[in-house]
Amino acid sequence: LRRECDALNPVFFHYITARTPYVALKYAMTADGKLAARTGRSQWITGETARAHVHSLRSRYRAILVGVGTVLADDPLLNCRMEGGRDPLRVVLDSRLRTPLSARVCRTAQTQKTIFVCAVENAQKRAQLQALGAEVLCLGGADGRVDWVALMRELGAREIDSVLIEGGAEVQYSADRK
């Protein structure tokens, strides 16, 4: 009976018991197991139905998380394009704050809450991102990368109950390890 109850609302039950967000990993892959074209160039590998489902997920999850690689490759907005949908908090893992200030996640940070999470402090870039309306958290781990456990605790403390990871292979791999 407990499993059946938990299955009714996994986000709520996870958040209430762990005080960290429920995390879901969203990715698409080609028939040969790739996440992008052979050239390394990212491209749509799904159809309209799958893309509509992604926007439904973005509306339901409180935060969407990607890595700097996705920002550099795709320059995404990370918003919800579904009518009546809610834009999620954007969380960008960027260990060394390499995201260009011209990126769409930076240019739209005044209108859609955005948090950059770094592992190495860069006061100048922090100030530039903050001037654009973004928040910067420095949560470096012993390995020089973002500390996932600290990040999940921080998001939980901010009452972010769910995170949709849409990052590329590196973010997926590091999330899976934690």
What role is predicted for each listed range?
Residues 177-178:
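Short glycine/threonine-rich loop-to-helix capping motif typified by GTGT followed
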Residues 11-31, 35-161, 170-173:
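Active-site ligand-binding patch in enzyme domains
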Residues 165:
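Gly/Thr-rich phosphate-binding loop signature of adenosyl cofactor/nucleotide-binding cores
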Residues 1-10:
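Active-site loop-to-helix "anion-binding N-cap" substructures in soluble metabolic enzymes
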